[in-house]
Amino acid sequence: MNLRDKLDVYLRLSRMDRPIGTLLLMWPCLMALWFAAGGMPDIKVLVIFVIGVVVMRACGCVINDYADRNLDAHVERTQSRPLASGEISSKEALIVFLVMALFAFCLVLLLNPLVVKLSVVGIILTIIYPFTKRYTNMPQMFLGTVWSWSIPMAYAAQTGTVPAEAWWLFAANWCWTVAYDTMYAMVDRDDDLKVGIKSTAILFGKYDRQIIAAFQFAALACFIIAGLIAERGVIYGGGILAFIGFALYQQKLIFGRERAPCFKAFLNNNWAGMALFIALGLDYLVF
């Protein structure tokens, strides 16, 4: 395998060729930075977090594929992944993970001690998550914690503390993550049942759409509370309305529980997050 082919394998292993996960992780992180700063955050902090989100999402993908390397070959959507297809060894994948994790940790060393402490918890959560699919029916809820961990870190980096407002935003993103990752799990539900992977899509069963709606509603409520605490204005409110519109559209897509529409609903959450962040940024700019 030449260098170009090897780089292609690394890109696919870390999902750099599929940025949806990075974007879903980025929007709440950026929102946290803007809320914490009361507008435009410190440039140094912003750059570190943007790079950190990209790297840590890649880390999560690599360790996820390592944990699932013997299962992915039996799932239609994942059987072409580099570890499952044998394009890269388990040892090499672990080395890639360690290098990226070390790089991410070096980034947070440029910030204050509280951020460094929180980052250690974050990397531990990232390593644990892939294995929760073996032992619990609620891995999406654990993922919600992993994918929301950048929020207290962002507040800590910008303000040196993690105020109550941060935890309302954390709760909002946690509920939102459970909702959209359950949509994602609906795509693989039949295959997951065959190979023994657990998920909320399986746990919720015939009530999946209703429970997803409940999590979407809870996320909206927490986003609204975070906005009220920060005294945000009508533009942020417009972002909330847009988020509601996207949530309703996603419910329409998952109504028939078919794979392609469920995956489309999952992808649509990127636009929901982007709309809410842009509204927040404009709200701070205007008010």
Curated annotation (Swiss-Prot):
Single GO BP term: ubiquinone biosynthetic process
Transmembrane domains' residue ranges: 20-38, 95-115, 211-231, 235-255, 266-286
Needed cofactors: Mg(2+)
Domain of life according to the entry: Bacteria
Keyword Cell membrane in record: yes
One Gene Ontology cellular component annotation held by this UniProt entry: plasma membrane
SS bond list: none
Alphabetized InterPro entries for the sequence: HB_polyprenyltransferase-like, Prenyltransferase, UbiA_prenyltransferase, UbiA_prenylTrfase_CS, UbiA_sf
GO molecular function: 4-hydroxybenzoate polyprenyltransferase activity
Keywords carried by this UniProt record: Cell inner membrane, Cell membrane, Magnesium, Membrane, Transferase, Transmembrane, Transmembrane helix, Ubiquinone biosynthesis
Compartmental location: Cell inner membrane
Enzyme class: transferase
CDD domains attached to this UniProt entry: PT_UbiA_COQ2
Catalysed reactions, semicolon-separated: all-trans-octaprenyl diphosphate + 4-hydroxybenzoate = 4-hydroxy-3-(all-trans-octaprenyl)benzoate + diphosphate
EC assignment: 2.5.1.39
Membrane topology: Multi-pass membrane protein
Pathway: Cofactor biosynthesis; ubiquinone biosynthesis
The keyword Transmembrane appears for this protein: yes
Family to which this protein belongs: Belongs to the UbiA prenyltransferase family.
HAMAP family per the UniProt record, alphabetical: UbiA
UniProt function note: Catalyzes the prenylation of para-hydroxybenzoate (PHB) with an all-trans polyprenyl group. Mediates the second step in the final reaction sequence of ubiquinone-8 (UQ-8) biosynthesis, which is the condensation of the polyisoprenoid side chain with PHB, generating the first membrane-bound Q intermediate 3-octaprenyl-4-hydroxybenzoate.
Annotated protein name in UniProt: 4-hydroxybenzoate octaprenyltransferase
Taxonomic classification: Bacteria, Pseudomonadati, Pseudomonadota, Gammaproteobacteria, Alteromonadales
